Amino acid sequence: MLSPAIITLPWRPDAAEHYFAPLSALPWAMLLHSGFADHPHNRFDILVAAPRATLLTRGEQTWVDDGETAFVSAEDPLQLLQQQLDRQPFTPQPHDDLPFLGGALGLFGYDLGRRFERLPAHAQADIALPDMAVGIYDWALIVDHQRQQISLLSYDDPQQRLQWLQAQSRPAMKPFALTSAWQSNMSRQQYGEKFRQVQAYLHSGDCYQVNLAQRFQARYVGDEWQAFRQLNTANRAPFSAFIRLEEGAILSLSPERFIQLRQGEIQTRPIKGTLPRLDSPQEDARQAEKLANSPKDRAENLMIVDLMRNDIGRVAVPGSVRVPELFVVEPFPAVHHLVSTITARLPATLHASDLLRAAFPGGSITGAPKVRAMEIIDELEPQRRNAWCGSIGYLSYCGNMDTSITIRTLTAWQGQLYCSAGGGIVADSEENAEYQETFDKVNRILHQLEN
């Protein structure tokens, strides 16, 4: 039962940024950040780099490289990931104050879902980033904001890893700047046509809810890490992340947990229902109350709660699925969100990867029924979603998992920055309001990068 050696470093609240900055241009350097959020899920920042092994999935193929051997496989990517975890000699016991004890950490793009469900291929695959990019790490730096403690854990010598961290230096990079205006992949008129097509499907009983998105794109130069730091400070999202890939980067400012697994206990917190924040405290409080009591938003939320109960029920202990919180309003800097919580137990015979596969991609960003909604998304959205609406997170050696839904997430690739926003459309949705909601969700992010 190999457990990591742990050393404690002097406290500084910006430790994650401080230690990550010199690594931020290194492929496979990844940071899960709690976004300085005033939020119950803001406790930990997790930093990793220099993985023992890597897994990259593109379409039907996964490239696995463990430093000694490299091979390509058409097997289920999450099965390959589980095999890599099982091959490592590390079996630490879960630790309340250290959520990640080494293991798998990375990106599970929306289109990884094509490996688990049969979907059409209408939408253009125009961003050549992987569907899955996950490293297996035998060390991590964990910043605990609650206990004000910084732990460096390693299955090797943590002092040596600390020296390595301190020896890293950043290559000089140009300051970040947009070099063009943001442009959508659809006009207002095209959005309206797609909205009406969704309505036709809804009224024919084909589905109950479809998440329809538009994608914004701009050219940029310079350092994506600098852009992330600016956005992270301003947006304070509890499931933020910066992922440096071999070609490109993911900048995530997500408010949404996908699935957490802690010592066999499952929790998922789907967001469905959004209204913009208002400047006046009194009006803002009324806005929150309006969202809490909105029959349309509650109906949308309930559909996704039912879908997630069903997805998790595929692998959970029979009879263990519960809904302890329904329709709770959570405020974020730009918007109020309506959130529900679903819990269950995972049988000891199954792994975190089985749970992830059963529920992937998250129902809150597809619609219901899920597979039909995904087919409609592929038909109506011009391009594949790629990293957006997938998941970022970890599967720890100790069996724990925590993942986000990658909404409010930017993809940087070949000098282009992409940012999508959508909303769940139901039978009584109003076209102008749905169109405006896509802007409410990302306007703040888009404008911050223009300045």
Predicted regions and their residues:
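Extended alpha-helical targeting/anchoring segments
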Residues: 1-451
